[in-house]
Structures are given as C-alpha cells and as structure tokens.
Amino acid sequence: MKIVLASASSRRRQLLSRLIENFQVVVSDFDEDSVVFQGRCESYVMKLAEGKAKDVCRKLTNESSIVIGCDTAVFLRGKVMGKPRDIQEAFHMLKALSGNEHDVYSGIAIMDKVLHKTVKSFVRTTVKFSEIDDRCIKNYLKKGEYKDKAGAYGIQGYGGVFVKEIHGCYYNVVGLPLNKLYNMLSGMGVNL
C-alpha cells in the first residue's frame, strides 16, 4: 500500500520521514478559503485537512493508497491566524501574539482508498509568547521565516526564541503531530 502526503510543506515531509521511509508527496490544490471558520477550532482544521486529502485522492489513479492531509492554524482570542499574506500582516500577528497565550491546532485526515474509509482527528497545543518589542519583530521579519507559517512564526527556527512556554505536542506547532499521526495510522492497520 502506498502512503501519500497531501502537502507542499517541507516541514511535514521531514517529519513524516521520521515515521515512514517511502512515501509520495502530492500537492493539494484544495481552496482553503472555501472553509469558513465557524467558531470551532478543531472542526475548522479537520475540514481543511479533509479537503486536502480528498483533493489528492481524486488525483490518484492508484487505488491502493492511504492519503494523509494535515492543516495547522493558530488561534488567538477566538480568531484564526493563518499564514500571513504579507509582511505587514505578519507584523500585526506577532504583535498580537506578544506576551499572550495562543492555541495551535492541527487537523489530520487519513483516507484509505481501498476501504473508502476516512479517519479524522486534531491536536491542540498551547503556546505562551514572551513580550516582543517592535524592533525585535521587525528584525525577525527581515529573516523571511514568517512566510508560509500559521501565526507568522516557526517554533523550529528563530521564531522559537519568542516561545516562553509550551503545553502539548511540540511537533503539532511545527505542523505535523507525530504521536497522533502514528496512533491514527496504526489504528488503520498501517505497519510503521
């Protein structure tokens, strides 16, 4: 059985390679803007993950595939912080996160094309940022690390210096909660 990761993320690819040696990457064309946040963080990220997995399933001609979709988002005071559109939005995101706790949710959807079965779940991690002054934020943004990252920071990179505390799965904040994924795949009978 072929394992397929429905993601363009190099971070997810690196993390998945810790669990599975041989897998294929197929980038999803799912329109993330088609999913509207309706107040439930876990539902939102699971719908996004499922949309990505379904899109890739439709592209595959090989029927014996298991497709993994994942999406990660940052939530602060009930609002979604996705990937910043530009440097100004990234600045405002980091300014809002400064000195505050926020939640990082990842949704995972695994689709078995043989059994026509989908399993979905989510992981929540709480992250507390230190106070960050404007100069520090601007210096960070010059590094370009904020691009393509929910909440405009990467905990695994320089953005990790902003993190004062973390409660929950570190890999969830990076973008692929390994423990949850391992348990989901094992529960579907995938030998890891």
Swiss-Prot record:
Q: Which UniProt keywords apply?
A: Cytoplasm, Hydrolase, Nucleotide metabolism
Top-level enzyme category: hydrolase
SUPFAM superfamilies per UniProt = ITPase-like
Looking up InterPro entries in the UniProt record yields: ITPase-like_fam (IPR029001), Maf-like (IPR003697)
Q: Where is this site: Important for substrate specificity?
A: 11, 72, 156
Q: List the disulfide bonds.
A: none
Q: What does this protein need as cofactor? A: a divalent metal cation
The source's superkingdom equals Bacteria
GO CC, alphabetical: cytoplasm
Q: Which reaction does it catalyse?
A: dTTP + H2O = dTMP + diphosphate + H(+); UTP + H2O = UMP + diphosphate + H(+)
Q: Which Pfam families match?
A: Maf
Write out the annotated subcellular location.
Cytoplasm
Q: Name one GO biological process term.
A: nucleotide metabolic process
Q: What's the family? A: Belongs to the Maf family. YhdE subfamily.
NCBIfam families from the xrefs? maf, PRK00078.1
HAMAP family according to UniProt: Maf
Q: What is the protein named?
A: dTTP/UTP pyrophosphatase
